[in-house]
Amino acid sequence: MNLLNLFNPLQTAGMEEEFDAIKIGIASPETIRSWSYGEVKKPETINYRTFKPERDGLFCAKIFGPVKDYECLCGKYKRLKFKGVTCEKCGVEVTLSKVRRERMGHIELAAPVAHIWFLKSLPSRLGMVLDMTLRDIERVLYFEAFVVTDPGMTPLQRRQLLTEDDYYNKLDEYGDDFDAKMGAEGIRELLRTLNVAGEIEILRQELESTGSDTKIKKIAKRLKVLEAFHRSGMKLEWMIMDVLPVLPPDLRPLVPLDGGRFATSDLNDLYRRVINRNNRLKRLLELHAPDIIVRNEKRMLQEAVDSLLDNGRRGKAMTGANKRPLKSLADMIKGKGGRFRQNLLGKRVDYSGRSVITVGPYLRLHQCGLPKKMALELFKPFIFHKLEKQGLASTVKAAKKLVEQEVPEVWDILEEVIREHPIMLNRAPTLHRLGIQAFEPILIEGKAIQLHPLVCAAFNADFDGDQMAVHVPLSLEAQMEARTLMLASNNVLSPANGEPIIVPSQDIVLGLYYMTRDRINAKGEGSLFADVKEVHRAYHTKQVELGTKITVRLREWVKNEAGEFEPVVNRYETTVGRALLSEILPKGLPFEYVNKALKKKEISKLINASFRLCGLRDTVIFADHLMYTGFGFAAKGGISIAVDDMEIPKEKAALLAEANAEVKEIEDQYRQGLVTNGERYNKVVDIWGRAGDKIAKAMMDNLSKQKVIDRDGNEVDQESFNSIYMMADSGARGSAAQIKQLSGMRGLMAKPDGSIIETPITSNFREGLTVLQYFIATHGARKGLADTALKTANSGYLTRRLVDVTQDLVVVEDDCGTSDGFVMKAVVQGGDVIEALRDRILGRVTASDVVDPSSGETLVEAGTLLTEKLVDMIDQSGVDEVKVRTPITCKTRHGLCAHCYGRDLARGKLVNAGEAVGVIAAQSIGEPGTQLTMRTFHIGGAASRAAAASQVEAKSNGTARFSSQMRYVANNKGELVVIGRSCEVVIHDDIGRERERHKVPYGAILLVQDGMAIKAGQTLATWDPHTRPMITEHAGMVKFENVEEGVTVAKQTDDVTGLSTLVVIDGKRRSSSASKLLRPTVKLLDENGVEICIPGTSTPVSMAFPVGAVITVREGQEIGKGDVLARIPQASSKTRDITGGLPRVAELFEARVPKDAGMLAEITGTVSFGKETKGKQRLIVTDVDGVAYETLISKEKQILVHDGQVVNRGETIVDGAVDPHDILRLQGIEALARYIVQEVQEVYRLQGVKISDKHIEVIIRQMLRRVNIADAGETGFITGEQVERGDVMAANEKALEEGKEPARYENVLLGITKASLSTDSFISAASFQETTRVLTEAAIMGKQDELRGLKENVIVGRLIPAGTGLTYHRSRHQQWQGVEQETAETQVTDE
């Protein structure tokens, strides 16, 4: 389909061309001439006196069409009746002037010119095709050298470069036997004579015969480009242009400004330069000017065309009169202000308005207040229609007048028009889909939009001057969709985690909390009431207070077997407030949900329970009532803040004095030289940190309780009614940390570089700060503000990349039928269950049957959606792990299936076909991005304390189990010594559920055994945190090798104890060169003095001591299994900065290789060390068959294994951050997914943000969508190329059907940016980043965009293939297939 017709406005609606794909390619000179309506010969634009376009110029009316509708230039033919006539005087065709937006011209170039994109867009495509370097091609193109195009019978090589002197010498030598050319002619000649098919054959043979990796890569790249040309039928020489298309003049307008000047598009300037130089060159060629002059002119022409296509890509950018680089064609389409992102993906829309928002506390959830003035403007066409229909106006003009005069009838009509016509409200930035919701408008006076308080959380709106935009859905379908899908009352749950997002906050929470708190000995305590009405009367006649404890008979509604509600009457001990609140409970919600002091969390649970038990409609009504009630009681409660509410604890002075004394003691120790400066600093920071916590605790204990006299006259404690405490406790506003600053002490502050200042601020805000304290505090405050600004931009960019990588992922079918999935367990860290199994599997589909561990019967069959009921049952039966389906293993080719995705979190049932789950996942991960921190944490003070733990204790009763990687030996004392690297002790409860999971380091001593029953608080294992031991797994007599005092080891004597030890010296520091290569090792001998071998092999046991190891055994000493040979001191708090927050999330999704990455074992086998090289150690792993795998590791890295140790494939052998690519390669997709999900979740968890694992898995699916072909088999792929997973699967299926050999492939992990750019859709990739590179590549490949994703369809202006658009696309597809079948059938019948 011709692209020009895609945007052709002259085609009538009936002629709308249907298209299914867009193809991009390189235009041949013939194509360019066929687009053109004439050649532009002159650089002139318009005549400055008559303002008419010059003939044959850049705005020529003859070529591009008339300037005025239906009027030729000289004015001979005017009006519609001459339509289609061409004026014989001025040559202009009489037609609409808007053809000037689409008619193109052309320039015939006097010399061919290379297209800069194919030359300079890296990797250079011209260079690839010709197998020449970019530098060489440039020298030819810009007339610095000749290139041999046809060597003839001479010894010259084709494509050889000759300088000018060389050329003339060779000319003298060989005469006309050879051909050499300069400039684009030379390159074009080379391209024209290149035999593509022959070259492909040669390359394929080379590919099979060569062994070197770099060569294979190089050949594969070249092969790919040549095959693309071969396939698409484009000619190589089209990359060199003979003819240049000229953009239609209305797309590069010339606008007269007042004062006789013109504002012009930069393109006109650029075209003018090209035409000038081209005409000059033509003249020079006619005059047969000297070579050197012609060459210079040709070079200038090449540069002018380069600037027109992509200014600044080569050399200096061309500048206009004001020294600013001119905007070229490439700049028009790329970047944020380019065509893609500015005009195609983000358009401004009519029927919209914006205004400030204020609170509408009396609204219902689905309503919003719309100012009358705004509504009148937005709904104008509807009002005109109604006015005409009711006969109040005869024409549109009359109707317009009525509306402008604002006659009373207009307001009545406006009311009618607006009724049941939803409008959409949007608050920028729209970070997730709840940033746009539909409401029914209520007309209000004033100029501000009124917003329902409960939807503020979704919009992230507050009323400090926020503005919102209003949009009107016009068509009936649009109104329907807005009402059913976007109405605020239909969006109660958050798509990110499936929890209610319509949750009361702030005042409402405070009001409800105040209403449901109980008071001891309040008026009327202990009264009995027959029903709620009686409580009402008592409360209004002031017989009882809100917090009075009473007993009341309540009627509740319970579902019976038939599913109908039956009343049940119960007596409850409760308070007056709670009894009053019970009135608004929906049917079927038990009273116990509100029979407690309602804090924010409880209210959230209440709404969630209401949604699950009573359904959407009742929940919305309930939420509204909660809001009205909450506001009412917040007003009646009159809770406010006074200075007296900030009670400073009496213990503060004593605690400060104690801390000061401790600090003084440390300072004294430092002066005596007992501790280093670093230790002193850490300890001081620690002391103040603890002091701050103690004061805060004292303050909270003091605030949270107050003494009262009960009915019997005794003094008792009750929860405090202190206003500040109530605000924090209810979750309405503020937190313990903030109260600490108000009435405790402010605590430690950080310097701008993130290090902690060791003198804390001991005052609080109530006491006031001194000048110095205030100054210290300003650092942090300012850094916070600067951080926020950066954070917003970074977070937005992350969201954009995430959306781009997942935008084409839509649920397209119900079930792909796979039984693959991942095994889900509870997330346990240290001793705590962070996320229970039930929360992880809720809303997923089982991949295999869930079996009861005790009875062995099937609880849930495979393929079942796990609802709340089912997960509760699984939870109670003690199932430890469940295999569930996941998007990562879904077999659907373009998109996902509903069963692999599971429940639609925002609707609470299985996801519908057409749901754009990719975009939802991206929004859910990106939206909280602004809440994440930006900083990298320096481990100091508190954190290093945690790092130096020396034991683990059980936190609950249960049974100890060792993880599968656990390896240990028993030493002579009978202690179990851990000799594995990734060992864990897991604690199970009585029914076998995992409760805790503790990591146990290498060298720890286990104090429990597998399967042993343990009590809470029991120590499981102990170890020395400051040294890392080296442990023998064999018994025998010690024999040292290369352990020479003063050469490889040094004797160190402890001053205090007088004991001496041997310490291994670093090879670099040793004196003689021979001793540098010596490695001190230990071997073991048996009683006969023979070397002991590793069991089952003939390799002797030999363990090398690492540098810095303190040797703890003596020559000839008898040692047993599990004994310590040496200890390696650990640098106690080596501050490795942890990347946290947003940068960490970005790092994970971009799949970056970490800075000092650790290393995993490539194979299972035995470790040994080879010969060291300079600064590197050689680590060798030998497997059972004796195959060795060796790697070089730099000396600075900490190797976690030692000689003779057995490691499993994928086990960590060198300390450092884990590289996700390694995990994928060595442990597989499931391990990788688990790693990324866990790491991402950890960042969000720290900020208290809940996101469903599902969303992260959707992103991971997209990161894994490409594979590397390891062996192409007989599928036609090229070995080493990256292709879509689905394409390989399809090709392999086909190959197997035909009995051919399928391709073997390896999984590849791509970062989200790379994955976005490597998508099949070039339109999507080009509109994302690196537009030039993407389009160049697509053009050469002759790519076809199937318009599968959402982005591509938005760009070409169609409905997106998601949601209601999916059905439209499907029905169109079926029609197409039907048409194709019909045509096929008719052909058959004709024959």
Swiss-Prot record:
Q: Which Gene3D superfamilies match?
A: 1.10.132.30, 1.10.150.390, 1.10.1790.20, 1.10.40.90, 2.40.40.20, 2.40.50.100, RNA polymerase II, clamp domain (4.10.860.120), RNA polymerase Rpb1, domain 3 (1.10.274.100)
- Where on this chain does Mg(2+) bind? D462, D464, D466
As for family, the record states: Belongs to the RNA polymerase beta' chain family.
Under SUPFAM superfamilies, the record lists:
beta and beta-prime subunits of DNA dependent RNA-polymerase
Return the broad EC class: transferase
Top-rank taxon, per record: Bacteria
Q: Name one GO molecular function term.
A: DNA binding
Q: How does it assemble?
A: The RNAP catalytic core consists of 2 alpha, 1 beta, 1 beta' and 1 omega subunit. When a sigma factor is associated with the core the holoenzyme is formed, which can initiate transcription.
The record's annotation in Pfam families points to: RNA_pol_Rpb1_1, RNA_pol_Rpb1_2, RNA_pol_Rpb1_3, RNA_pol_Rpb1_4, RNA_pol_Rpb1_5
Give the UniProt keywords, A-Z. Answer: DNA-directed RNA polymerase, Magnesium, Metal-binding, Nucleotidyltransferase, Transcription, Transferase, Zinc
Q: What is this protein called?
A: DNA-directed RNA polymerase subunit beta'
Q: Does the keyword Metal-binding apply?
A: yes
Which residues are noted in the entry as Zn(2+) 1-binding? Answer: C72, C74, C87, C90
Its job: DNA-dependent RNA polymerase catalyzes the transcription of DNA into RNA using the four ribonucleoside triphosphates as substrates.
Taken from the UniProt entry, a GO cellular component term is: DNA-directed RNA polymerase complex
Gene source species: Neisseria meningitidis serogroup A / serotype 4A (strain DSM 15465 / Z2491)
> What gene is this protein translated from?
rpoC
- Give TM regions: none
Record's cofactor remark: Binds 1 Mg(2+) ion per subunit.
**EC code(s) of this entry:** 2.7.7.6
Annotated binding of Zn(2+) 2, by residue: C816, C890, C897, C900
PANTHER family per the UniProt record, alphabetical: DNA-DIRECTED RNA POLYMERASE, DNA-DIRECTED RNA POLYMERASE SUBUNIT BETA
The record's listing under HAMAP family reads:
RNApol_bact_RpoC
